[in-house]
Amino acid sequence: MDLNKQLKKYAQLIAKVGLNVQEGQPVLVRASTETREFVAKVVEACYELGAKRVSVEWRDQELTKLNLKYQSEESLSTVGQWYIDKYQDELDEGAAFLSIIGDDPDGLAGVDSAKLKASMVGRSKAMRNYMKSIMSDECPWCVVSASTVGWAKRLYPELDDEAAYLKLWDQILSACRSTGDDPVAEWEEHIKVLDEKAKFLHENELVKLHITNDLGTDLYVGLPKNHIWQSAGSYAKKADRFVANIPTEEVFTMPHKDETSGIVYNAKPLNYSGVLIDNFWLKFEEGKVVDFGAERGYDVLKNLLETDEGSRRIGEMALVPYDSPISNTKILFLETLFDENAACHIALGKAYPTCVQGGPEMTDEQLAEVGANDSLVHVDFMIGEATTNITGYTADGKEVAIFRDGNWA
């Protein structure tokens, strides 16, 4: 393939479908220094749609590792007011926000888990208003990825750097439906299909889901009254439709924070802030994790669960068929953006207010009353695989087959 041409199309897809950049709109991009060449294409695509300005905030995993090594927990947990103000100013101006991920999935392995937690919690507290705006769809936002040597070599260690880098680009573009002549048109069709699935679930007015599989998962997930099933397209208050994740294969909603019970096992490793957690399980009672275990990344999982009261409860339930483009690659990307779109998943932490009627206009207290979970974190992990069965229940006890053998029933 002509990679340069393909990457230009991918950048245009991100700007047009992902962010849906409007004339005169500012754009803020967060990206790794390793993705500089692709970021330039995205910046140009945004300007071509009429962006007022496109600002880029760079991050570097090696520098992050040094900061975690040498700074104190107190220093790591402190975020300057100037940084908070920068994001608030962008929000006030109606900006669109883009995050381009691509770091080595295990690049922060070995760092002090207490320092990592201090850094994560400090940033989450400081950026709470921004994250509330994002999760309420008050502005357009999108998370995408770009190939880097560090990530590619983790997936294809047998290849040299260049071959691995190119192979990962090939997989990313394929998973993102960006290899054809008109990716934008292809995405319009894809969104329609997901909207139909969401409509089916919404019309059944389910009150509970029962999830089982051969890994040992046996989980009941209660759903709040007036919950909404969302799909690929979102609608910002100040803009037209945007797509928050490219790729996306999911239909998702808000669980009731107090109504999850049973046990769940992960189906794929979880990459949490540059550290892999794997072969783990969580036991729930009355919505809360009461016991857990992990063969890899136990301390990081423990710190995640101890972030706050809401980090032991779930804020998202997402349905993804096992027979999906990303799952069918049989590649473990070690990156949640991709792996969550290869399997059904749940998220520990904060719920999306958009998943309940009137949610974006509710106060935190009102959201809690209807069953929405609140937390500083929102961390997806994969629970679905080829043997996953999901049955829905209506208020009058009727059973609705949702998934059988990993796919839509």
For each of these PLM feature ranges, what is it?
Residues M1-S261, G392, K398-V400, W408:
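Active-site bordering "gate/hinge" segments
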Residues Q12, H202-N204, S273-V275, G310, ...:
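Short solvent-exposed loop/turn micro-motifs enriched in small/polar/acidic residues
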Residues A109-D112, K153-P157, A232-S234, V275-D278, ...:
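A short secondary-structure junction signal
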Residues G222, F292-G293, F403:
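Short linear motifs in exposed loops
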Residues V251-E309:
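Long, well-ordered mid-to-C-terminal structural blocks that present hydrophobic/aromatic surfaces
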Residues E259-S261, I277-N279, E286-V289, R312-E316, ...:
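Active-site lining segments that contact anionic ligands and/or coordinate catalytic metals
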Residues D291-P360:
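Dual-mode signal for accessory low-complexity, basic/Gly-rich regions
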Residues E365-A409:
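Extended hydrophobic packing segments that form well-structured cores
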